[in-house]
Amino acid sequence: MPIHSSRPTRLARHAMIAAILLSSTSPMPAVAGGVTGQATEWTQLANNTELISLVGKSAEQVNNQITQISQLAEQIQNQLNIYRNMLQNTAQLPNHIWGQVENDLKNLQNVVNEGQGVAFSMGNVEDVMKQRFQSFAEMKSNLPDGASFSTTYQNWSGTNRDTIAGTLKAANLTSEQFSSEESTMSSLRSMSESSDGQMKALQVGHQIAAQQVAQMQKLRGLVSQQMTMMGTWYQSEQAQKDLAQARREQFFSGTEHDIRGGQTMEPRW
């Protein structure tokens, strides 16, 4: 999927961040940095108006995270290529260099996990929005065959996992060998004992890093489409009615909530 070329409107970006905040009420995997980690700080914000009042504070958060993941994958890809060239000119990489290889491959694992975490979170966005707003639930996506974003993110994740598994299988390796930090280190220690093992690890890592760069481009395109759809919904007449109703409900409830270190947030309309 190509990267969406048009820049989202300010309202579209705002709607996306509101959706991310809404998704914080659903379970999410722990992902370092990024959207899922920050969203968990707002799990107390069950009121729709409070959630919307935080819109715009982190408008580019999702795209920035995807960019960072993609850049790290590309850096790892380039570094592993350097190690491959070094290995071609020597019998075996010395221990201190192999230690750097192990660190890069562990970082590559984190790249995969963070990408999966973003897809999981953004899939939750649509589900939660449909639960909160009937007008959003009635909107049709602009995806092929009218597929939901939630299902499309699941398909993206499944394809990513299958591609990695296929790459490992081609090298007579399995996903189970790299399913945890402990098993990964054990596998890498075993592969480090020979020049052939080192080269195999470098080639597989290089392939997976290249795949992640391509997968992040697809994920960015999917997020861009979702932002566009949410911007369209946010600007619709029915959405404004839904949000106005949420404001009235909060006004008559007369309640306030402390947010993030005691700072009181009030909706601004």
Curated annotation (Swiss-Prot):
It comes from the Bacteria. Residues 1-32 form the signal peptide. Keywords: Conjugation, Plasmid, Signal. NCBIfam families: PRK13842.1 (NF010416), TrbJ_Ti (TIGR02780). This is Conjugal transfer protein TrbJ.
